[in-house]
Amino acid sequence: MLAILKTPRIALVRPSVNLFLMRYMGKFRLKRVGGNLILHSHLPPVNSKAFARFVNEQLVGRSAGPSHAQIGLTSACPQHCGCCYSRRRAGQPVDTETIIKAIRDLKRLGVFWLGFTGGEPLLNRDIVRITGSAGDDCAIKLFTTGCGLTRELAAGLQRAGLYSVSVSLDHPEEAVHDQGRGYPGAYRAARRAIDTFLDLGTVHVAVSTVLTREMINSSQAEDFLGFLEGLGIHEAWLSEVKPSVPACWNREAVITEAERLKLVDLQDRHNQKGKMTVNYLGHFEGREHFGCNAGSKMVYVDASGEVGPCVFTPMTFGNLRERPLAEIVREMRKRFPSGDSCFINDNYELLKRHHRGRMPLGREETLAILKEARFGPPAGFFQLHGKGDRGRRAR
């Protein structure tokens, strides 16, 4: 933690907030990857300009703007995952210059962490140029199936500034993973991508895993972590199935609070070993920490330019080709207070009621949903930091 405490201006942060952050960060161990000191991949390296921006703009400056964003670089993907948040999205893809401008605009709004997603983002031929356009004061993380990766492309991404990659791998057995992905060869593509990035030696390598309730409520999740440790990766990035598409709009698919806490405990126990970092999204976004920041601190721009709260929430407030991105984000923030639990888990039944066959749901349906949506009170961090809005219905 000394590396974090040495960050310029960290002493200007309120003591109660610093204590909160130290307790949270104390659940992880810093890992040196290349020249980067990394706590986990949902935060920039603590010795980076991006982390300094987090301290200066978000902690000291208390910026009201977003801190994190994800951009879909393409909707194309050879795999066919049943609960993929992007699979049913339609629309003409934006061009490279529009993506680069969106990155520039997001940084102006306060974004210091940017995730590239898809579809399969590696299928965007300009991905290296797009990565380089973010500069050295914004942390870039890539989410990929591994399809389309070459050693040359991996090296190009590293030179352009990529600091972390999450390769999708959901099961230790090849046949099971391939079946879930609807793509023969998915497992081998993922394993090749993991090895390719590890061979570079300077990119933080994670595996992103979507856990089913069956895996959570058996020994499968813990057994899988043991398998991942054997791959030599730096981090296991865990999430659960989200009710983002009609196939998952049912109670049987949605995690319970008890199951979330079970995964939090699993993460904490593994992190005490100090080997591979386990980073469970529901821990970061739990009410005891930072809560759900969809539409508040998190922004999602899909491959066709639709701007929404997060990758898991199929709603749009407008298209950046039709309205300025900053204007769309400001409106979205007014309607999306930061709450203490996952918005889509709490409100997916409203999507069932208002869905008209289009994904993402259009602006009209989005506003109708928000008239009925439930938002919880601010999570622990925002109660201390003073930026959480009161739990309420959006108007």
Residue ranges and their predicted role:
Residues 3, 170, 175, 180-290, ...:
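Radical SAM enzyme [4Fe-4S]-AdoMet core and its adjacent flexible, acidic
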Residues 7-9, 15-22, 27-35, 43-155:
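Conserved alpha-helical substructure of the radical SAM core
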Residues 69, 295-297:
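Short loop/turn microsegments at loop-to-beta-strand junctions
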Residues 107, 135, 156-160, 199, ...:
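Acidic (Asp/Glu)-rich catalytic clusters
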Residues 312-395:
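Flexible mid-to-C-terminal extensions adjoining Fe-S/redox cofactors in radical SAM and related proteins
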